[in-house]
């Protein structure tokens, strides 16, 4: 029994159990904005909603979704003309960033037409986002990813689905997911 969930001990116990392949249910309360995988996905969503958002694009490029190094990002940002957005500079590049540009072009082309859930699912499946996030952040990233998908579905049932609306809805309150622990389940 852990007295509080705020300390790092609780998170470390869950991580150690997952690494030891013990059947673990995870935390009973998950604050999705604290999950790194969720932050990476929402950074990409923020860029898709507003391509002029240099910070969100930089965060997405450095995330496991694209795997850019600090040097690659610095080179792109430093060598761009004055008053040029990072997205414009990336589009003007030739060569090395072809795969990144293809993914971003695909997602930008769909951002105005797909519902938030479908857009997130496209990032995670078609473009290998789930695999990349879990490979870099560990199995515990799956909990945050699944919670974000569930929240996207919940949002779509309560509001007219739009990407900017979903991002505002996520920001409006600290979204916490409370899990129902199944008594019949043989999980820690």
Feature locations, PLM:
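Basic, alpha-helical interaction scaffolds
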Residues: 95-99, 104-107
